[in-house]
From Swiss-Prot:
Encoding gene (name): ZNF732
Family recorded in the similarity comment: Belongs to the krueppel C2H2-type zinc-finger protein family.
Ranges of residues in domain KRAB: 4-75
SMART domains to which the protein is assigned, alphabetical: KRAB, ZnF_C2H2
An example molecular function term from Gene Ontology annotations: zinc ion binding
Record lineage: Eukaryota, Metazoa, Chordata, Craniata, Vertebrata
One Gene Ontology biological process: regulation of DNA-templated transcription
Protein name (database record): Zinc finger protein 732
């Protein structure tokens, strides 16, 4: 008869083997060893060397204590583990369920069973032990060198505690299944933060959070999605990334709707409960999230805590300031792998990628038209509803979007906040500035597959394609005339309405379109920004410059179909054609 010892239900690691385990595996080791210790104590087995237990509870390296020195002192309790208690197939099943689910790294073919527990036993002592033994749970450690299996024993009382959650912490009443979790939880009440980052000095309560935080300094991103190649610094963020699997593990029993994040489920529950606990006293707006209350209040108070040291502009949020700072630094950390173009924001990069993929995920339910951006879809929807809730106080013109109204107001104020860094020219709209920049870069990334013509802006390409298709979707309700683009239709409408909202402050002359007013103003200012590189002559309009250039090149492209005569300018050709039509010149 041999005594049951702590060594029979334990596993030893050398310092080299201990380093092979990751933090999660080390924590699992501590939990199992401490549970084995408590199970032996409950069976009446006294441990002669408690130093190992103390080391484990203090989260010190266990290999500093010799496990074989911990000898059982109770003669009545002995061990007799046969293959009936530890079937190989059962171990393999446990291996697949526990390790493959948790680590997904190795197979069961390299499994080593510990067979040191085959011993003879007194019949009475065995029966006493067998009565206390309710389950055998196989715990497995995975190491780069080898895999070991060992068992933990739990009597019926301890098993009942595990299922009913009777391990309570007296301070707050919270219960835990593992002793290490209880120890870590006690640190919250004590304010203890035992894990300190050597790089920046930040303290943490939990080892796992500390371990993931250290990766920020190294720049390491160990979690890679095999489906799309996205990389993550933490396992929690990687777990949240379930785009490809479509997995939605958080289900609401009320309506059956499922979500891939618990936070989204919590927000959804408020819809059913009609829980809208936060109401703004200033404007009456209902806010479902407490975190957004303080942010919303800053709209009314005008509080802007975050100031840009470069230009003095202030912001409500630190994240907005960070994005703004990139304007001054020129930082563009997000680069397109397809064309090499860089962006200051990841969201803009994601939208840009759709140019290459052709993806248009936002579809209009009314007409089926698809868009790359959700904002463009929202603008498009106003075409069907005809709703225009935003009205200009200056001229009474109505708009479907608030941003469009703000842009319109610049017509009256003359404000041009968007300035070209290359030539200093200012624009009232950012879109016009972006179009203008192409003049300096010469970039034309949008190419027509039909004829090969390239354009600097996607909108120009879309308009150009209609030439090949003959599509003219914008029709005048007054006379039925159709146009390729909405802007041309709006210009045409002024013929019927006689509306001329754009008035020159210098001479009072009015125009139906802002571009005509801009061209007209150059008469008063004498500005001639378009200069001929050949002779230096300057012009107010680019079109006139292009016509003038034919003098130097000798190009006479417009030809009369009747007589074949060529002209420098198309306007001369039009006048010439009147000879044949009999129209008065």
């Amino acid at each position: 008869m041999e005594l049951l010892t702590f060594r029979d239900v334990a596993i030893e690691f050398s310092p080299e083997e201990w380093k092979c385990l990751d933090p999660a595996q080390q924590n699992l080791y501590r939990d199992v060893m401490l549970e084995n210790y408590r199970n032996l104590i409950s069976l009446g087995v006294a441990i002669s060397n408690p130093d190992l237990v103390i080391y484990l509870e203090q989260r010190k390296e266990p290999y500093k204590v010799k496990i074989h020195e911990t000898v059982a002192k109770h003669p009545a309790v002995c061990s007799h583990f046969t293959q009936d208690f530890l079937p190989v197939q059962g171990i393999e099943d446990s291996f697949h369920k526990l390790i493959l689910r948790r680590y997904e790294k190795c197979g069961h073919e390299n499994l080593e069973l510990r067979k040191s527990c085959k011993r003879k036993v007194q019949k009475g002592g065995y029966n006493e032990f067998n009565q206390c033994l309710s389950t055998i749970q196989s715990k497995i450690f995975q190491c780069n060198v080898h895999v070991k299996v060992f068992s933990t024993f739990s009597n019926s009382n301890q098993r009942r505690i595990r299922h009913t959650g009777e391990k309570h912490f007296k301070e707050c009443g919270k219960s835990f299944q593992k002793f290490s979790d209880l120890t870590q939880h006690q640190g919250i009440h004590a304010g203890e933060k035992p894990y300190t980052c050597e790089e920046c000095g930040k303290d943490f309560k939990w080892y796992l959070i500390f371990n993931e935080y250290e990766i920020i300094h190294t720049g390491e991103k160990p979690f890679t999605c095999e489906e799309c190649g996205n990389i993550f610094t933490t396992s929690s963020n990687f777990a949240k990334h379930k785009v490809h699997t479509g997995e939605k593990s958080y289900k609401y029993e009320e309506c059956g709707k499922a979500f891939n994040r618990s936070s989204t489920l919590t927000k959804h529950k408020r819809i059913h409960a009609e829980e809208k606990p936060f109401t703004c006293e200033e404007c009456g707006k209902i806010i479902t999230s407490s975190s957004n209350v303080a942010k919303h209040k800053k709209i009314h108070t005008g509080e802007k805590l975050y100031k840009c040291q470069e230009c003095g502009k202030v912001f409500n949020r630190s994240t907005t300031l960070t994005k703004h700072n990139r304007i001054h630094t020129g930082e563009k950390p997000y680069t397109c792998e397809e064309c090499g173009k860089a962006f200051s924001r990841s969201s803009v990069l994601n939208e840009h990628k759709r140019i290459h993929t052709g993806e248009k995920p936002y579809k209009c339910e009314q007409c089926g038209k698809a868009f790359r951006q959700s904002a463009t879809l929202n603008k498009h929807k106003s075409i069907h509803t005809g709703e225009k809730p935003y009205t200009c106080e200056e001229c009474g013109k109505a708009f479907s979007r608030f941003t469009t109204l703000n842009e319109h107001k610049r017509i009256h104020t003359g404000e041009r906040p968007h300035k070209c860094e290359e030539c200093g020219k200012a624009f009232g709209w950012s879109t016009d500035l972006n179009k203008h920049k192409i003049i300096h870069t010469g970039e034309k990334p949008y190419k027509c597959e039909e004829c090969g013509k390239a354009f600097g802006w996607s909108a120009y390409l879309s308009k150009h394609k209609k030439i090949h298709t003959g599509e003219k979707p914008y029709r005048c309700e007054e006379c039925g005339k159709a146009f390729l683009c909405s802007r041309a239709l709006n210009k045409h409408k002024t013929i019927h309405t006689g509306e001329k909202p754009y008035e020159c402050e210098e001479c009072g002359k009015a125009f139906g379109w802002s571009t005509y007013l801009s061209k007209h103003k150059k008469i008063h200012t004498g500005e001639k920004p378009y200069r001929c590189e050949e002779c230096g002559k300057a012009f107010r309009r680019s079109r006139v410059l292009n016509k003038y250039k034919t003098i130097h090149t000798g190009d006479k492209t417009p030809k009369c179909k009747g007589c074949g005569k060529a002209f420098k300018w198309s306007s001369y050709l039009n006048q010439h054609n009147k000879i044949y039509t009999g129209e008065k010149l």
